Amino acid sequence: MATINLATKFQEKVDEKFVAESKSALVTNREYDFVGAHTIKVYSVGTAEMNDYGRNTDGTSRYGTVKDLDATAQEISMEKDRSFTFAIDKADEDETLGALNAGKALARQLREVVIPEVDTYAYKKMADNAGTKVTETITNETAYTAMVTANETLDENEVPYEGRVAICTPAYVSLLKQDKNAVLDSDIGQDLKLRGVIANMDGASIQKVPSKLLPTGQNFILAHPVATTLAVKLEEYKIHTEPQGVSGALVEGRIYYTAFVRTNKAKAIYSSKKQASV
C-alpha cells in the first residue's frame, strides 16, 4: 500500500495555513513546546521588595533581610489528541474534474473543522482562566464603556498596551457599532482581516468571531497573547493511495495539541459574559 506523508510534503504550507487562518493564533503564543515530553512544568518566580539601604547600620547585610524568592510550578500536559479519516473514491475524483482531491480536501478539513476546533478550545481556556471575570448586560449605550473598563483593568494590571486583542461576538460588535461613543478605526491590514479583525479601538484590535467559537453567553474577551500558550506537538496527514477495501485514496490526519494560561499572566485576560437571566 503506497503512502504519501502530507506532513512531510506539505508541512510548511500546512503550518502557514494554520497560522494564517486560525483566529486564536492572534491571541496566543508558541513560547513552549512539548517535544519529547507529555508534560512540562512552567515556573513563576516572584520578586523581592525594595528596602532603604542601611548605610550607617550594623549587621551583615545593609541591603535588607535576605529571603528566598518564591517559585511556583504550573504542570501542563498535552490534552487533545484528535484525528480524522475519509476516503476519496477514484470515480468521484474523476467525475468532479479533480475538485475532490487530497490537497483541496485537506485544506477544507483544516479550514472548516480542525482550525475552528482548536480555536474553540483555546478561547475556552482563556475564558475559564481569565484573571478578571465579569457578568454584565450590555446595550448599545454601554458597549463602549464595557470595553473601556476592560482596558482600564488591563492597564492597572500592567499588561502591555501594544498587542491587545478583543475577541468579540457578532452581537457585541453590532452593539458597539451602535454606541455613539465608540470610534472604530477600520484601517487595518489584509492579514488581520483574514483573522477576523474588523477595526482598532483605543489601541486594541477588535476581532469578530462566530459566537459558536466562544463559550456560551460570552460578550467578549480582551487579552494579550503573552498570557495563553497554544502548543501543537504533532500534525500528521497521510494519503494511502492503494488501501485495502477502498477504490481510491484513504486520507488520515492527526493533531495533538494543548493550550494553557500561565498562572502569573492570567491578569492579562478579561472575560465579559452575559448576565444570567432570572
Question: Where are the model-predicted features located?
Answer:
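Flexible, active-site-adjacent loop/turn segments at secondary-structure boundaries
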Residues: 40, 67, 74-76, 84-86, ...
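Extended, solvent-exposed, turn-rich assembly/linker loops in the middle of proteins
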Residues: 128-198
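Sequence/fold signature of self-assembling virion shell proteins
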Residues: 2-26, 31-51, 72-80, 179-278
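Generic alpha-helix structural propensity
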Residues: 37, 61, 81-83, 101, ...
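Short Gly/aromatic-enriched secondary-structure transition segments
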Residues: 55-61
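Active-site-surrounding "flap" and adjacent substrate/cofactor-binding loops of secreted or lumenal enzymes
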Residues: 62-70
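Structured, hydrophobic secondary-structure cores that serve as assembly/anchoring elements
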Residues: 41, 47, 73, 79-98, ...
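Alpha-helical scaffold segments that mediate packing/assembly in large oligomeric complexes
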Residues: 91-157, 270-278
